[in-house]
Amino acid sequence: MKPPSSIQTSEFDSSDEEPIEDEQTPIHISWLSLSRVNCSQFLGLCALPGCKFKDVRRNVQKDTEELKSCGIQDIFVFCTRGELSKYRVPNLLDLYQQCGIITHHHPIADGGTPDIASCCEIMEELTTCLKNYRKTLIHCYGGLGRSCLVAACLLLYLSDTISPEQAIDSLRDLRGSGAIQTIKQYNYLHEFRDKLAAHLSSRDSQSRSVSR
């Protein structure tokens, strides 16, 4: 007869034959109201669907189906392809497209910021989605750093009156104190309007010189 300790070990041993069960909780989406920047739409933010990393065990098929059932039409993904592989969802972008969700992939390094030209492109694409009343979601890995940075930039992009601090506060009220995670991201927000204006001015100058 086996000693009790070995019986317990065999009963609760999580071997390859008995994989850890995926989480059954619905994926949590936070909806940012854009009413304060004269837009009637909401922008969704969430963590990486289907993520399997450390103690997180989500089911990518289930999460994707939930997003589809929520009516999500466009998704902006800020994870790099390397991250998608690391977090065990290497085919996530294809899966979105198979579900009929339009996918906008704008990779930003974890903890980092996009260059201003890339950020301007993201702002223009987001604005187009929202103006066309498309239900839009953005996500990175945790839904706190890069996603909140982009959402805060959108608030500044859509309104001249909201301040960087107010934009940060809006995201922290929505996603918690971990939103906007690095000094680099914090500084980027405070410099965003000046850099955007310089970029747009340069782009206009180039287009004028080409058309001559």
UniProtKB/Swiss-Prot annotation:
CDD domains: CDKN3-like
Effect of N91K: In HCC; patient BX-10
SUPFAM superfamilies, per the entry: (Phosphotyrosine protein) phosphatases II
GO cellular component: cytoplasm; cytosol; nucleus; perinuclear region of cytoplasm
Assigned keywords, A-Z: Cell cycle, Cytoplasm, Disease variant, Hydrolase, Protein phosphatase
GO biological process, one term: regulation of cyclin-dependent protein serine/threonine kinase activity
Protein's cellular compartments: Cytoplasm, Perinuclear region
Outcome of mutating D94V: In HCC; patient NT1
Domain named Tyrosine-protein phosphatase: residues: 33-201
Disordered: annotated segments: 1-20
Induction: Up-regulated in breast and prostate cancer cells.
Effect seen on changing N187S: In HCC; patient NT4
Domain of life: Eukaryota
Catalysis: reaction(s): O-phospho-L-tyrosyl-[protein] + H2O = L-tyrosyl-[protein] + phosphate; O-phospho-L-threonyl-[protein] + H2O = L-threonyl-[protein] + phosphate; O-phospho-L-seryl-[protein] + H2O = L-seryl-[protein] + phosphate
GO molecular function, one term: protein tyrosine/serine/threonine phosphatase activity
Disease linked to the protein: Hepatocellular carcinoma: A primary malignant neoplasm of epithelial liver cells. The major risk factors for HCC are chronic hepatitis B virus (HBV) infection, chronic hepatitis C virus (HCV) infection, prolonged dietary aflatoxin exposure, alcoholic cirrhosis, and cirrhosis due to other causes.
Subunit structure and binding partners: Interacts with cyclin-dependent kinases such as CDK1, CDK2 and CDK3. Does not interact with CDK4. Interacts (via C-terminus) with phosphorylated CDK2 (via C-terminal helix). Interacts with MS4A3 (via C-terminus); the interaction enhances CDKN3 enzymatic activity.
Similarity field: Belongs to the protein-tyrosine phosphatase family.
The protein's name in its UniProt record: Cyclin-dependent kinase inhibitor 3
Organism: Homo sapiens (Human)
